[in-house]
Design a protein with these regions (language model features):
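Short, functionally important structural connectors and interaction interfaces within domains
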Residues: 4-5, 23-29, 48-51, 129-130, ...
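Hydrophobic face of amphipathic alpha-helices that form TPR/SEL1-like repeat modules
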Residues: 1-30, 124
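N-terminal alpha-helical segment of soluble enzymes
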Residues: 17, 25-90, 94
Length: 169
């Protein structure tokens, strides 16, 4: 039986030894084993995410828009396969799984469009006499790594609903 491990920084995490069987809801039979993530594996994932954040925190709105549009393109290009996986994973009917795969791409595109609206504000700071004639401004900037736990019942949609806004902002 195949064994799935965590995928961190373009590589599989080292096996911990502990795993559990994934049982397909369609036939109630084990399909593959899933490696349990140890504290070390989780720490490695957080460190990898932090490293990626440091490399990308100065990304432009255009870059973030491009990333989100690429996410939508990848979801659309793989929609049929993703729908099959959703069916196997949670036992959804294919029609619902197809809808979910498409909805993830739509949400990513919506977030890409929203990035273009992330303008700062110019704020007068003349509440104090020394601020007369002066202005401050606000700007949206990334602040760090996001951890998200996604429920099982809509794996693509709920993941994208957490991932895309984090990439957008």
């Amino acid at each position: 039986m195949n064994r799935l491990t965590s995928w961190i920084n373009d590589t599989h995490a080292a096996p911990s030894g502990a795993a559990f069987a994934f049982v397909a809801p369609q036939h109630n039979q084990p399909v593959f084993d899933i490696e349990e993530s140890t504290e070390d594996v989780i720490d490695a994932a957080v460190q990898s995410a932090q490293q990626a954040f440091l490399q990308n925190k100065r990304s432009t709105l255009a870059q973030r828009t491009a990333w989100l549009n690429l996410l939508a393109q990848v979801l659309e290009a793989n929609a049929a396969r993703l729908a099959e996986i959703i069916c196997q994973d949670v036992g959804k009917p294919i029609r619902a799984a197809n809808f979910e795969a498409g909805r993830g791409a739509q949400f990513a595109r919506a977030c890409a469009a929203a990035v273009q609206q992330l303008a700062g504000e110019v704020v007068p700071v003349d509440a104090a006499a020394a601020g007369a004639g002066h202005f401050g401004f606000t700007r949206h900037v990334p602040i760090g790594v996001v951890a998200a736990i996604t429920p099982f019942n809509a794996p693509i949609n709920l993941l994208v609903q957490k991932l895309a806004p984090a990439l957008a902002t």
